[in-house]
Each structure stands twice: as C-alpha cells, then as structure tokens.
C-alpha cells in the first residue's frame, strides 16, 4: 500500500493513476498530454493541465524543480522550448526532453514533473519576519 499525504484525483481515463501525489514536502505530477494541432497548442494545453493539477494544492509552476518532457518528434524541441519559456521564470527548472515513439490520445507532447511544496516554509518565514501590524500579511502573525 502506498502512503501518500495527499493525492490530486485520478488521471483522466484511468482508474488507478493519480494526477499528482505528495509525500512530505515532495510532489510528483503524472504526465499531462497536450491537445491541439500544433506543438505550440499541445505545449500550452499540457502546461495548463500541469497548472490545474498544481492548483489543487495551492502550488504554482515555480514549485516544480524538474520537468520531463516526452516529444513524439524531437525536431519539435525548439518550438516546444519557445512556448515553454513563456510559463517559467528564473531560476529555471531542470528539464529533460526525450523523444518517444508514441503517446496516448495521439498527443505530440507529454509533461510530468517533480517538485517541492514550500508553502509551509514560506508562511513560517513571512510570520517570523513580520514587524508591523499584520495588515499586509493577512493577520497570520502573532
């Protein structure tokens, strides 16, 4: 039996695969496939699926430290990266891009990831550094 602190629903079309699991501060996102005709459209939809999964935990893309990208055609790498760069900021995450012979649902791109949920630490740092009347930090300080 797997012991996860949290899991984010089942992956569409499956009965036994979670979209994301978290154990401790670490999380793992199952592959999210793209939709659309072009590699750009597929990249955007795949990333938006990743963003949706992350939002179930209150997380954002900057919490992902490593992506693995599966491309049906490695010649799409440059077009993928030109689209992907619009979603990530410095410091950029690690990323491995590999070519595969086939993907589910005739997708040309699939993206999975792993990361660290730092929300608890961010909140603690905010509370410990508060030196005002707490109006700007939501009243979470004591």
Feature-to-residue mapping (PLM):
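N-terminal presequence-like segments and the immediate start of the first folded domain
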Residues: 1-62, 71-142
């Amino acid at each position: 039996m797997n012991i996860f602190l949290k899991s984010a629903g089942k992956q569409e079309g499956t009965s036994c695969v979670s979209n994301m699991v978290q154990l401790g501060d670490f999380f793992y996102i199952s592959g999210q496939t793209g939709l659309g005709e072009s590699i750009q459209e597929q990249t955007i939809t795949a990333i938006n699926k990743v963003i949706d999964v992350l939002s179930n935990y209150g997380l954002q893309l900057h919490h992902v430290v490593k992506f693995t990208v599966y491309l049906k055609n490695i010649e799409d790498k440059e077009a993928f990266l030109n689209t992907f760069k619009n979603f990530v900021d410095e410091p950029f995450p690690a990323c491995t891009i590999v070519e595969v012979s086939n993907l589910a649902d005739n997708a040309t791109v699939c993206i999975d990831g792993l990361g660290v949920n730092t929300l608890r630490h961010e909140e603690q740092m905010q509370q410990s550094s508060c030196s005002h009347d707490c109006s700007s930090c939501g009243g979470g300080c004591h």
